[in-house]
């Protein structure tokens, strides 16, 4: 059952989908981590794949940049393809001095300057939080694999090139761990349609120091984040 943005047949997606922003990262995850991965959609070059990880059927699909883009894909996956869990695996920027480039952040919540969730929630503030069980499973996966991961709030920004640089001071004061562009939207879509969601991000650049990773590194590595996401699915299955 194709949608305007996904041309996969019914049953093409697993009940759990990992979602990076970059479709080429989706391709990398499928080719590197999944067995017997098959491409199931390619509309607008937003690639999606389904395969298995340690025998568990899992899908991966890009969601693009920003809340409007990721909201479209998340909504269609949930309502048209029966997806129950979405794990965003993406990059973020750091503002706190104690957060370093390549750190992994498990986003238990996501603040935002976007008005999209207010439109959804009748002009009220929606508390965009991750699913607790998925968050707990990710923390357990990180510990089991010996991967250091921080847990806390992300900030989902509408503008990549923001003119309000003073807002970074406010974010630091409030303990924001990473700045990205999608988590708050994905959390709200999941809540609206009865699914579950979690965002796991790797710090790709530091807004204060200027340190950054290359675009190639962002596309082809960040394996710790992906490992946590995949292992958390297996842990979650055992807990259910």
Curated annotation (Swiss-Prot):
Residues under site feature: Important for catalytic activity: 218
Protein transport among keywords: no
Catalytic activity: a purine D-ribonucleoside + phosphate = a purine nucleobase + alpha-D-ribose 1-phosphate; a purine 2'-deoxy-D-ribonucleoside + phosphate = a purine nucleobase + 2-deoxy-alpha-D-ribose 1-phosphate
Its EC number(s): 2.4.2.1
Binding site for phosphate: 21, 25, 44, 88-91
Enzyme class: transferase
A Pfam family that the UniProt record links to this protein: PNP_UDP_1
Swiss-Prot/TrEMBL GO biological process terms: purine nucleoside catabolic process
Keyword presence, Transport: no
Function of the protein: Catalyzes the reversible phosphorolytic breakdown of the N-glycosidic bond in the beta-(deoxy)ribonucleoside molecules, with the formation of the corresponding free purine bases and pentose-1-phosphate.
Protein name: Purine nucleoside phosphorylase DeoD-type
Organism in which the protein naturally occurs: Actinobacillus pleuropneumoniae serotype 5b (strain L20)
